[in-house]
């Protein structure tokens, strides 16, 4: 049968429904007919050379991130970093100066925010503003980065725009700036990427099934040949035994025993075919979830200076400060600046304990550290934190480092 997956999106202030199709036929003939219909529907919109390049890359299926790398698919890394990651974990997004400039707003930071808020109000799009003394401000490291660009007087009066992922998505699709065309082009490119990757998964599965079936047919042919040879041997043995007067009862028993062994092997082969069908069903589920999986990862940014980074250092000062550790999260260029400033002005003897480059969501990493600590008496009573500051006994320093490293490794889990 042809399984249809429906995905709803909103483009240019209108809602559209996109259908993707997965194959599940009852027999080989039905599968071939359905596959031809699917190719007629989809292939005309795809670049077949990119698809073939991905198929030729490996006999193991690759994820969407590797797929983009292999095919050199043209997609905006900033959009993935600032939008699709937010969509994946459903977190709130701070509208930073970088985002406003990416959307095409020009001028001073304050003027950019005013222009964007004007659009939001005109289109009745929800947003929130945090005052400078809001206790949740520390959840958005880029607020601190943007604050450095403003005077203290302006910072004290500033309000920082916060939006959820759906509202942010609506807003960028309603832009009328110099970059609005590029942003809409991104959505069209992303739709093509989804279709191309789903077709890649289909083709990969088809190839894998053919390889399995070919191997299985070879095995069955060998078993049929063995059975035929066994029967021929039995006939010859009967003839030989008859010629020398042996009792045919013993020969018949041996023949039945051989036949039973062959039947057992055939039954085992049928079990193997059933296992393959169950594996295919599981793969159907994987293909169906690809629409979610594409949001789970993002290609690495080409410019190292704007890749996200997470650093934890030990202050190593002579005071008895309860918070002896400090975390910095943000783009690499920002982290380098903060480290230099803190080392020259406050912590000349600092020791960097953790430096994770290209951590896709460093803020998320720090929050998950707190989540891991909370509720566990063996850790909760021995760790304290305030903002980016962390305190623990020196005996637990190694344990703290291991927790961060373990949390970072979880980004590789699919």
From Swiss-Prot:
Residues 209-293 form a coiled coil. InterPro entries: DUF3627 (IPR022549), MSV199_dom (IPR018879). Keywords: Coiled coil. This is Putative MSV199 domain-containing protein 148R. It comes from Invertebrate iridescent virus 6.
